[in-house]
Each structure stands twice: as structure tokens, then as C-alpha cells.
Amino acid sequence: MSDSPLVQVRDLVKHFPVRGGVLQRTVGWVQAVDGVSFDIRRGETLGLVGESGCGKTTVGRLLLRLIEPTSGSIKFDGVELTQLNGASLRPYRRRMQIIFQDPYASLDPRTPIGDSIGEGLRIHGLGTGPERREKVRRMMDLVGLMPYHARRYPHEFSGGQRQRIGIARALVLEPDLIVCDEPVSALDVSIQAQVLNLLNQLQRELGLTYVFVAHNMGVVEHISDRVAVMYLGRIAELADRRDLFHQQEHPYTQALMSAIPIPNPELRRQRVILKGDVPSPVNPPSGCRFHPRCQLRQQLDGPAICAQAVPPLIELGGGHECACHFRQPGGATPEEIARSMSAVGTPGR
């Protein structure tokens, strides 16, 4: 894994219009992604996690330009993708691929899987017919499929086999970056492990870079090098996998981790119970978007700054970043930070 970034994202925003009335006029905006910034290093796996509706899948699709950003910057290998269109974007589409969540819905039921895997080669005009068939055969072998499978249709395969087909289709163009959009969430646990191990093996052999979108923290721990935790369109915490699972800094991450079961009946994890529902992205809370449900804010008697100011994503040390007013470099406790804010006149209660 290289320290040089393959992808650099800065202040990425995506708002979807909400339309209503007879004329279908825009009556509001869904703030799906709101000011997200991060880097993806070459050869690493960056996990994107969070509850449903947090914006993690939207981020993955924005990276691939499957949907257009409202604003912000996406640099791939030093090139600003948001400035490219049509023919100028085409060479970069070859270098970025996606593995979809539903391995059946993402395959054409009327097309033999050999043709589906080789479709990218045909679209980009790569190779002759025999060369494409040989490339498809090699990709199928790489993911554990047999040559005779090429003539079969998607309904003839199990869920795990269909996901292997999706992986082969993503690999056939020899991409640098693959966005894995919850690729194992629809599979049985035993099949999940097989697919995750396959992805790890392919990354080692081919030098791939992954963005792994998931809501299962156990899966993310197994495959990721770094993890970004999202909440309502923003990154709450970003850290090395080992650091994040050893010491969570953001209250939301702490709540997520407390829900992971421990496979030992004699050990118990202290659960953090979040009150209330996730707010609507059409009308998100002001300030820190987590503040209406935040257990730390409740412990500190409701500091006003949480509702008044957006906390920046700051580095606490060792590449561990957190967006919380009461987490700062140096190891001060939230209570100490709250007292220092009161002393200098920062809004308290």
C-alpha cells in the first residue's frame, strides 16, 4: 500500500431536489452528502460505514461520476474528474468500476454471463472477439468460475456465484479503483466470508484499491485498512481500522461499536442506546447533525455550541480524525474542554 493518494475528495456535496405539486416544482432538497473530504491511498481499502440514509452509497457513486455532484472536488490520479465529460471522461471510467449490492438485479437475466462479463471490453473496443473471450475466461478463472459457466444465465447461479460474476465484470477492464457497494449484505454469512476472502486475495494479487461501503461493522473490520464513519451526509470519524476499533472518539461511533455482539457469553459490552430517530436529510439539525441524539451532549447538560456550529473534522493524532466539539488533540476530557469553552466565552449552555 502506497501513501500517495489515488483519489482526493474535497468538500463534496450532493443535494437531490424534492419535487411536489401539480407542476412538480422543487420544494426542498435532500442533503445526501454535505461537505465530505478524504483521501484514498493506492492499494488500500477505505471502509464507508453508517446507518441507512447516511450518504455512503451516494459518495461511492459520486466518485465514479455515476451521479453528478452539486459541488466539490474529486481528483483521480491528480486529474479533476468534475471538469471532465463525455470522451474526456471515458478513459477514467475504465479505471474505476463498481460491484453492486444486489448480485441478481445487476445482471441482465436474458444475457449469458460470459457476455455480461465481457460487455465492458466491447463498449471500450478492446481486443478482437477471440481476445475478449480469452480475457473473460481468465477473469472467470480468477474468481473461481468454470469456463462452461460462460454460456449460462444468471438464474442458474447461487447468490455467491452471482456476486463472483459481478466481481469478474468489474475486473475485466483492469481498473485501479473498485467501489464495493455492500457486496455481501445480500449473502449468507458463510458465503460472505468466501467473497471477502476473494476480494482480499484479488487486492494482493492485482494491487487494487477499494472503497468498501457497508453497514456491518464486523465486515468492515475484516476487510478495511481505514474506516470513515458517516452520519447524515457528513463524516463523523476517520481512522485506521485498528485505532477505530480500539478507541472510538466520536459519540456516534461509540454507539455503533457498542451494538456489535461479542462471541463470548461471559463478556458483555456496555450498550449505548441512542434516543430518537435519525433526522430527515431534507431538514437536518443545525450545528452538529448528531446533537439531538448525542449521549455526550446529554452528559454535558446540552452545550449550545453543538446546535450552533458545525464541528470541523480535525486530526487528533496518528491520522485519527474526529468531528466533535469536545474532542481535541492532547487528550483533554470532554468535561475539561467544556470548562475551557466557558472560560473563554464560547457558547456553553
Model-derived features with residue positions:
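ABC ATPase NBD coupling module
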Residues: 22-27, 81-97, 123, 129-130, ...
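Conserved ABC transporter NBD signature motif
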Residues: 72-80
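Conserved ABC ATPase "signature" region
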Residues: 79-80, 131-148, 201, 254-258
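Conserved ABC ATPase signature
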Residues: 153-157, 161
